[in-house]
């Protein structure tokens, strides 16, 4: 049976994630007390082959060590194919979402302000965050974007196969929190300053032609390829499910997009399971 444990700070998108997983055929249980997880697996494994469980900060055991031990036991005992997703967003975004929804934070009942509750939740969820197979930062995601991202991550993964995600972004919007590696392309020649190239993106042929003619750009790409090709086998042997490679330039329109596309193409040719995401190409969609 496949098991996905969904966790994350309140307001980061867990409810959306569970709804998407239900649409994908998962039997979903919301806010399950963690100590009941082994019993739940036993009770439903004969009826369902896909199970998703959402863990809320209110349902954690008192001891972080007990939480880590229990999840490690479920992961290692071999009854299920275990994956864990952790959803998060910047503090300012969570504050904004709570202000707009007028909902009460789960920890606000403990006489904490909203800001204090968010910081306390960060501490309590640290064991889940640090051991997650996939971390998704929803700060700049619309509900549609988040739904599509979850579908891609779940459906695009074959059993025991590492998924290599290339993610372009603009530093002006912040570094993606889900990136395992981040490469800074801001020192490379910038098509933004060439009037006839400025309106295009790194996916368009005029920009691609210009950047591919720049020796520094191509050497940068080659060196990233070589580094990843060297260390991916070690990550695969370490049972990693996902490796996310962030490529950043100033605005996330030209250089980072081109480089991410080139790297994705190169590793597809090597037979890797590759996914690509351009975080800031279209920031006009309604945000989550």
UniProtKB/Swiss-Prot annotation:
Coiled coil residues, start to end: none
GO molecular function terms listed in the Swiss-Prot or TrEMBL record: ATP binding; GTP binding
Disulfide topology: none
Keyword Nucleotide-binding: yes
Residues that, per the record, bind GTP: 56-59
Record Pfam families: PapZ_C, RapZ-like_N
InterPro entries, A to Z: P-loop_NTPase, RapZ-like, RapZ-like_N, RapZ_C
Chain residues that bind ATP: 8-15
Keywords: ATP-binding, GTP-binding, Nucleotide-binding
Biological role stated in the UniProt entry: Displays ATPase and GTPase activities.
Family label: Belongs to the RapZ-like family.
Record protein name field: Nucleotide-binding protein AHA_3920
Organism: Aeromonas hydrophila subsp. hydrophila (strain ATCC 7966 / DSM 30187 / BCRC 13018 / CCUG 14551 / JCM 1027 / KCTC 2358 / NCIMB 9240 / NCTC 8049)
């Amino acid at each position: 049976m496949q098991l996905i444990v969904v966790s994350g700070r309140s307001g980061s998108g867990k409810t959306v994630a569970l709804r998407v997983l239900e649409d994908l055929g998962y039997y979903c249980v919301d806010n399950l007390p963690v100590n009941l997880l082994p019993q739940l697996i036993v009770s439903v494994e004969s009826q369902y082959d896909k199970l998703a469980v959402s863990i809320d900060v209110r349902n954690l055991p008192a001891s972080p060590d007990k939480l880590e031990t229990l999840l490690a036991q479920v992961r290692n005992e071999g009854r299920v194919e275990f994956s864990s997703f952790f959803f998060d967003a910047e503090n300012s975004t969570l504050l904004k979402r709570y202000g707009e929804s007028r909902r009460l934070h789960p920890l606000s009942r403990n006489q904490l302000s909203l800001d204090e509750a968010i910081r306390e939740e960060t501490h309590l969820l640290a064991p889940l965050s640090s051991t997650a197979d996939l971390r998704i930062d929803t700060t700049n995601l619309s509900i549609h974007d988040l739904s599509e991202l979850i579908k891609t991550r779940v459906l695009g993964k074959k059993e025991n196969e590492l998924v290599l995600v290339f993610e372009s972004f603009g530093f002006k919007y912040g570094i993606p929190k889900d990136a395992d590696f981040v490469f800074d392309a801001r020192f490379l020649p910038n098509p933004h300053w060439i009037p006839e190239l400025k309106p295009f993106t790194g996916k368009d042929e005029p920009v691609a032609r210009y950047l591919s003619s720049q020796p520094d750009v191509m050497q940068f790409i080659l060196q990233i390829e070589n580094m990843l090709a060297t260390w991916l086998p070690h990550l695969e042997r370490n049972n990693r499910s996902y490796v996310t490679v962030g490529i950043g330039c100033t605005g996330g329109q030209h250089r980072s997009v081109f480089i991410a596309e080139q790297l994705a193409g190169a590793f597809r040719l090597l037979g890797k399971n590759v996914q690509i995401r351009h975080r800031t190409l279209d920031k006009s969609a309604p945000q989550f």
